[in-house]
Amino acid sequence: MRWDSIIWDLDDDPDGNVQHCAEHGVTKEEVEEVFQNAADADISRSSGRPVVFGDTSTGRHLMVVYEEIDAATVYPVTAYDVPGSQNP
């Protein structure tokens, strides 16, 4: 599950993926860490989109919902702390 490119919307786009992640207190850098170090993958029960789970360097256990554009490119839709996890 390695991708070469992650597509980000403009930071100030209120409907963009950067803002969707920020609403949950997750930064672009944290999302990129999870993509690089994904520990598990699944399908979101609510959206039907693929998700990856992983830890950040600060110890947060995150879930990233994404769309795979092609074999090398992903578009993160949103990200948040895994429910029930003990995050710093």
Residues covered by each model-derived region:
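Ribonuclease/tRNase effector modules and their secretory precursors
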Residues: M1-P88
